[in-house]
């Protein structure tokens, strides 16, 4: 949701998207940039000219310069501020890692020869670099306000460049000692956006944002049933979260509600992750057996069946590969219900099957810690996962947690298996799936997303102060680098497709089970309706409201 508000309404990065559904919504186009960049023949230099007349909103009133873009990326490279997004840029821009580590006082690969020009020098050709620059993290930030924050917290003081701003932004102030957070943003409670008076529509591309509303009000509500009761009553206009089975049944069975349920391709995947450093999942044959035996059909039905998506059989959403892996299923079973016979055959090859009976019968196969979410549908999946793995001798010790991510993202916790994760692309390219989730160089002690620990080396383990993997775990870092350097083409698609196949057959870090749709519920008054393929949310940039409906 944050990506949607930032890219649709609040911020103007160099590049952006049209915020519509389908392939057209995945095409990157200039926003703050006046035109597409000049790219050197070797693909290592990108030169952008900024659009004139784009101004920061209150409390500032000045034109955006190239230095504001460079400063935003300096923040991305600052470990205390960059969240997870630094990886996308430090792996691409020359000198960014040196800046992040404190070895350099500036980023050598970013030049701002004048206020209207910014030049990037890359470490290697990067086929999706324009899409990385379209992420909100790369949108301009004014140093006079952003520089007041050496730790996270700037979000409540965000200075807008888009058509909307946070209510109360005009009262933030510009002196670090006197800053007051914008009244319209109360984290985890509410967000109110109003028109940015400094936004000039003549500087904008109307295909990016229509900006039809005068005001947006977002309320955070933990009672899911209350959200959908209010949506049905028409007292709220958008319910973008995941509706439960009872809500889905009402909206699909009642003619008066049917048109208000929108089913979109969400470019997202739900999966079970196995930690390659923890027994018994440190044996690839156990991981393959777990894939063979899992009843994916039952798992998908707990989510609500085909309306929620289709059974996933590999890592990347099919739309990202132009269908190159449609039909690829290395662990095929009848109706996706699991194949105990083939699972047992695979288990017999494992060192954890000591009796050669197709069962995991070593001590490591008992009381295997499984971290799950405590709310539906994950809580309803637990019995299916336990029952499936019990067929190959693995007994789980399931530990439900309201905040499962806080547990599994801490590397020292050594969680062997978790059914909590899902992933939605950060931008429409396979690098934002495979590159981000499986690059060993992106394993971090806090906020780790490579739960399987693919690519963990002895050196990295030492840096993280965790035991070195024994036996060593496989790495796909070289394959990621090869695919990332390939320019957009059939060859790039083929490269990622082959790497996906290798992940699922040789590395086997996941049991993917649901290639998920995005379900959005709206009131009758939302007209026109549009979906934003980039953010995977309703298109706040283009929807309108008609109270006569």
Q: Language model features by range: what are they?
A:
Residues 520-549:
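Long beta-strand-rich cores associated with HINT superfamily self-processing modules
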Residues 167-173, 180-194, 204, 217-278, ...:
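Extracellular/periplasmic solute-recognition and catalytic clefts
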Residues 18-20, 104-106, 125-215, 225-226, ...:
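Gly/Pro-rich hinge or "lid" segments in bacterial periplasmic/extracellular proteins
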């Amino acid at each position: 949701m944050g990506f949607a508000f930032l890219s649709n309404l609040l911020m103007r990065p160099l590049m952006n998207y049209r915020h519509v559904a389908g392939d057209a919504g995945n095409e990157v186009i200039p926003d703050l940039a006046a035109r597409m960049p000049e790219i050197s023949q070797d693909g290592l230099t990108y030169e952008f000219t900024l659009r004139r007349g784009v101004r920061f909103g209150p409390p500032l009133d000045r034109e955006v310069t190239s230095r504001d873009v460079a400063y935003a990326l300096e923040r991305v490279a600052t470990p205390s501020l960059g969240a997870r997004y630094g990886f996308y840029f430090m792996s691409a821009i020359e000198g960014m890692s040196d800046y992040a580590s404190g070895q350099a006082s500036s980023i050598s690969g970013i030049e701002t020869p004048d206020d209207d020009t910014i030049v990037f020098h890359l470490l290697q050709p990067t086929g999706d670099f324009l899409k990385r620059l379209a992420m909100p993290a790369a949108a301009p930030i004014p140093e006079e306000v952003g520089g007041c924050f050496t730790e996270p917290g700037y979000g409540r003081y965000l200075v807008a460049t888009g058509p909307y701003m946070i209510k109360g932004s005009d009262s933030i102030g510009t002196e670090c000692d006197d800053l007051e957070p914008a009244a319209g943003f109360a984290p985890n409670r509410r967000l109110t956006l109003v028109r940015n008076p400094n936004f000039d529509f003549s500087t904008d591309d109307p295909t990016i944002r229509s900006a039809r509303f005068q005001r947006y009000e977002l309320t955070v509500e933990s009672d899911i049933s209350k959200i959908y009761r209010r949506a049905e009553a028409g007292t709220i206009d958008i319910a973008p979260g995941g509706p439960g089975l009872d809500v889905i049944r009402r909206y699909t069975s009642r003619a008066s509600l049917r048109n208000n349920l929108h089913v979109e391709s969400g470019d997202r995947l739900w999966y079970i992750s196995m930690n390659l450093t923890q027994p018994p999942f440190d044996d690839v044959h156990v991981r393959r057996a777990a894939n063979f035996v899992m009843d994916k059909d039952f798992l998908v039905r707990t989510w609500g069946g085909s309306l929620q998506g289709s059974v996933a059989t590999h890592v990347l959403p099919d739309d990202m590969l132009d269908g190159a892996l449609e039909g690829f299923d290395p662990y095929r079973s009848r109706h996706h219900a699991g194949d105990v016979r083939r699972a047992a055959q695979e288990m017999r090859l494992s060192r954890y099957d000591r009796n050669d009976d197709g069962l995991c019968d070593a001590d490591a196969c008992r009381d295997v810690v499984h971290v799950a979410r405590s709310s539906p549908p994950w809580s309803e999946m637990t019995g299916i996962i336990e029952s499936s793995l019990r067929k190959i001798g693995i007994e789980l010790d399931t530990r439900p947690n309201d905040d499962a991510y806080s547990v599994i993202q801490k590397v020292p916790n050594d969680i062997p298996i978790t059914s909590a994760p899902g992933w939605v692309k950060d931008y429409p390219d396979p690098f934002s799936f495979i590159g981000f989730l499986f690059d060993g160089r992106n394993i971090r002690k806090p906020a780790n997303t490579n739960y399987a620990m693919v690519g963990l080396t002895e050196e990295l383990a030492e840096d993280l102060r965790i035991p070195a993997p024994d036996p060593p775990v496989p790495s796909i870092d070289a394959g990621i680098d090869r695919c990332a350097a390939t320019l957009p083409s059939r060859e790039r698609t083929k490269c990622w497709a082959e790497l996906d196949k290798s992940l699922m057959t040789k590395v086997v870090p996941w049991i993917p089970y649901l290639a998920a749709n995005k379900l959005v519920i709206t009131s009758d008054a939302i007209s026109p309706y549009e979906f934003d393929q980039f953010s995977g949310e309703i298109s706040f940039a283009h929807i309108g409201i008609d109270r006569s409906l």
